[in-house]
Amino acid sequence: MACPIRVAVTQAEPVYLDLAASVKKACGLIAEAAQNGAKLVAFSECWLPGYPAWIWARPVDFELQTRYIYNSLPIESEAMELVKATAKEHSIAVALGFSEQSPSHSIYISQAIISPQGEVVMHRRKIKPTHMERTLFGDGSGADLNNVVEVDFGAEHGKIKVGCFACWEHTQPLLKYHSISQGEAIHISMWPPIDPSAGVDHPGLWSMTADGCQNLSQTYAIESTAYVLHSTSVCTQKGIETLKTQDGLSCRQPGGGHSCVIGPDGRRLTAPLGDGSPDAEGIVYADLDLTKVVATRGFLDIVGHYSRPDLLWLGVDREQKENIIAKQHKAAEQEAVQG
């Protein structure tokens, strides 16, 4: 049996709408996590260059939208190379949440898992952006269903299956079932800054609050019997002023940070950072005993002994759908067959 593996979950504010400064801060957090013994560090949804919370305050903002696109991260870029190099230098895996800029300047809610060797071993886009997110972000495609990858942590810990989802993907039963079928042992649950509930008169949905979102992460842990790294970010008063969200449903007040680690039976394993204030910045650490994943699956394995595929099953199309598909002429097709 491999020894316990230390993981790190960030609870930090990006430099909103500033990709270069946010990447610099991310690299500092990666180094800090590694120096404290972590072998995997998780960031929150769209941490680069920050979650665009103004979408929950007003229907459109051309100025901020344009600025956001320019500061979103292309997967092939110097900024991504810097993050990869930092992971390799410190021999730590990184689960990165970012706004991805495509060559045509469309943007997507994306996630990447970078190995301790500095390679992007998994890159995916959120299958369906949530509600107002669709005013900015495009959809994922079939290949983005592959959200779990085996990460090589070296001789001490071996290869471990790590997966991730963004935010309300944790409400999607079919998507979750497909993810769980891939056998992850560690799951990164990425969220934006999330506000506490104001009670029965809360202006939004309880499922969008800190308690509601943690509930979804804990439910995923129970269903998957995997450890869940519940990663959230922070929005200070400076962030509110940058995003102009003081009158919105999200980031109305400083806070948003509720990061924690959840066990494979759904229990919360870590205390809040500092004094528990949601505007506290830092890193949450936990040492994971992966034998507890196996022990829990002895009771509950919804893609194994606790399933009935003869009665209920899931169909999946993992093909990537492209905008341009070259038509192959009949002569070329015949030549290919004859060859």
Swiss-Prot record:
Its biological purpose: Nitrilase that hydrolyzes preferentially phenylacetonitrile, (R,S)-mandelonitrile, and 3-indolylacetonitrile.
Family: Belongs to the carbon-nitrogen hydrolase superfamily. Nitrilase family.
GO molecular function, one term: hydro-lyase activity
Activity as a function of temperature: Optimum temperature is 40 degrees Celsius.
pH dependence statement: Optimum pH is 5.5-8.5.
Organism name: Fusarium vanettenii (strain ATCC MYA-4622 / CBS 123669 / FGSC 9596 / NRRL 45880 / 77-13-4) (Fusarium solani subsp. pisi)
Keyword hit for Hydrolase: yes
Name recorded for this polypeptide: Arylacetonitrilase
Matching Pfam families: CN_hydrolase (PF00795)
InterPro entries from the UniProt entry: C-N_Hydrolase, C-N_Hydrolase_sf, Nitrilase/CN_hydratase_CS, Nitrilases_CHs
Active site: E45, K126, C167
Keywords: Hydrolase
